[in-house]
């Protein structure tokens, strides 16, 4: 059995007109800071506790001069945080048996950026769960921007953009 945990930042530019029906047994709440969370049993992925941070920010909020910034920041979050300097965040998750790109990933869309990782239930004990929540916390308020990582990510994102260029 798997557990799916999602945390969403408030964003009111596109309010939901009809509430989304959640599966029975879903625990839903809102913290005093506005963070909306869901905890639910999820059969897929099997034997995993999946964490998702859904930030309601994407390319729609960018000006012409900021084009690509949301995607760039998505990449930078894996390059170091307050509690997980440099690549130690990815290294920690990989030490639990996860694979970067498969079990650890993120993407930026038109109106949201989603970070996710799936902790194997073999490792989903108190310490791993605490550290998983700390990762979500750091992604919200603890990303460090290393100039070396910035230069490296520029090249990666430019290559990704070339892959999407229709010309």
Regions found by a protein language model. Give the residues of each.
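Active-site-adjacent, His/Asp/Glu-enriched structural segments that form or flank metal-binding
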Residues: 55-70, 74-167
